[in-house]
């Protein structure tokens, strides 16, 4: 398919009036499995390897004692919402986004735990799945299950921001993430800032670990220009999307579907994409999650899953009592693989941003920007599906589809996050892909 077949000119954005962003800090009880007290003596480096890097933790303690004692624990929950989205952040558990939902259809576009059930996965041991985990300067970073600093800010444009951050004690890097919700927009924005205040060059890694609910009808959507996927360290490559879901089986499956990973857990990184989005879609719920960021700064696109197998069921029980399977749609800054560290110079400041938003009703995603997600795909016969889900109100927007030099669809529509566009268009001769 080439640029001769164009769809979608969304024009004339019209802001809604009188819509506010709400921000508050509240105390909420969440069922929590307690962890035991850490080792009181310092633990120095013993040659341990963690996530492909040196696994030293000093001066942090090791939280490796789990218990089966569950209590109703009070948490400080930081909440942001507007008419479209509602999110919750837990500064006492690493500043992660704990929950996010689309208010127009109640779809949780991040995996939302109904409780806190840690497992021994993090750098310091205890670790929580779900939501969005900020991994700086290492994967499943040291303070992922620890309290970190936070503050709230109201901005002149009407948006509101919850900032979380810390000075990391091993590298002495300072980092902060500002999570914002805007009036009249369905996106959640994260602004990331990493500073090296030390006189020495330091290594750093950034990956946002985004979890989503998944099932037999869930599909990972890499950009359509992706033809290859890589495993960790880039030591193994696979064709995309058709390849061995279960390594060593000798059988090819569609790697984009969670249901096909019946053998074991798996990570696959998108290789060589020139596009700036990543998505996932639940066809049973006809809804999904989209991420957009500058691909030159945030090139990493990856998914991880425990799998549709006994191993996956085991990890479900380890990490959650009631919330089911999840899949991680990770995105990496300054990195397209793990572990893939970059160097940050003395005094260097790195800043970038990324957004996520829910989509619905369009049966998949073929491209996405900050303004909208589009689906354009063949259905039956000569028909193509044309779908748009916008992140704000567009009045009298124009949808245009061209076949060669001829317009075959020209529509004026009103569209917003609560009102998607989905129609069929007939293409005169779809048999030759070079004409599309």
Where are these regions (language model features)?
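Beta-strand-rich binding/interaction modules
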Residues: 383-412
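Extended, loop-rich substrate-binding clefts of extracytoplasmic carbohydrate-active enzymes
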Residues: 44-72, 77-81, 128-186, 216, ...
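Short, aromatic- and glycine-rich surface loops/edge beta-strands on solvent-exposed regions
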Residues: 399-400, 431-436
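Asparagine-centered strand-capping/turn motif at beta-strand->loop junctions
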Residues: 193-200, 388-390
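A contiguous, surface-exposed recognition patch within enzymatic or periplasmic domains that forms
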Residues: 26-38, 42-43, 78-80, 85-99, ...
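Aromatic sugar-binding surface patches on proteins
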Residues: 415-430
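Surface beta-strand/loop "capping" patches
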Residues: 361-394
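Mature N-terminal, pre-catalytic/accessory segment of carbohydrate-active enzymes
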Residues: 19-67, 71-81, 85, 93-95, ...
């Amino acid at each position: 398919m080439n640029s001769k077949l164009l769809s979608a000119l969304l024009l004339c954005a019209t802001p809604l009036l009188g819509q506010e962003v709400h921000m508050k800090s509240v105390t909420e009880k969440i069922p929590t499995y307690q962890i035991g007290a850490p080792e009181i003596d310092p633990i120095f480096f013993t040659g341990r390897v963690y996530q492909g890097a040196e696994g030293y933790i000093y001066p942090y303690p090791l939280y490796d004692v789990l218990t089966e004692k569950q209590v109703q624990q009070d948490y400080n929950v930081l909440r942001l919402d507007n008419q479209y989205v509602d999110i919750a952040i837990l500064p006492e558990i690493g500043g992660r986004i704990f929950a996010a939902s689309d208010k127009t259809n109640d779809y949780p576009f991040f995996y939302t735990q109904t409780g806190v059930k840690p497992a021994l996965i993090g750098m310091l041991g205890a670790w929580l799945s779900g939501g969005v985990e900020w991994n700086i300067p290492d994967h499943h970073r040291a303070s992922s299950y620890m309290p970190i600093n936070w503050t709230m800010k109201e901005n002149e444009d009407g948006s509101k921001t919850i900032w979380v951050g810390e000075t990391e004690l091993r590298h002495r890097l300072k980092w902060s993430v500002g999570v914002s919700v805007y009036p009249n927009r369905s996106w959640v924005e994260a602004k990331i800032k990493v500073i090296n205040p030390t006189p020495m060059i330091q290594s750093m890694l950034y990956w946002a670990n985004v979890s989503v609910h998944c099932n037999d009808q869930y599909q990972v959507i890499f950009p359509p220009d992706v033809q290859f996927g890589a495993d960790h360290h880039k030591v193994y490559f696979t064709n995309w999307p058709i390849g061995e879901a279960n390594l060593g089986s000798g059988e090819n499956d569609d790697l984009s579907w969670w249901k096909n990973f019946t053998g074991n857990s798996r990570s696959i990184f998108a290789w060589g994409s020139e596009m700036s989005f990543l998505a996932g879609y639940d066809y049973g719920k006809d809804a999904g999650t989209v991420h957009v960021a500058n691909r030159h700064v945030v090139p990493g696109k990856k998914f991880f899953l425990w799998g549709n197998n006994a191993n996956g069921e085991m990890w479900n029980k380890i990490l959650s009592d009631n919330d089911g399977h999840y899949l991680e749609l990770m995105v990496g800054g300054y990195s397209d693989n793990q572990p893939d560290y970059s160097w940050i110079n003395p005094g260097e400041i790195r800043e970038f941003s990324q957004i996520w938003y829910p989509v619905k009703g369009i049966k998949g995603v073929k491209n996405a920007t900050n303004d909208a997600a589009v689906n354009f795909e063949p259905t039956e016969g000569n028909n193509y599906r044309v779908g748009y889900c916008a992140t704000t109100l567009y009045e009298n927007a124009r949808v245009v589809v061209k076949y060669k030099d001829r317009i075959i669809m020209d529509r004026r529509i009103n569209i917003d996050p609560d009102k998607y566009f989905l129609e069929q268009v007939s293409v005169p001769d779809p048999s030759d892909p070079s004409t599309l």
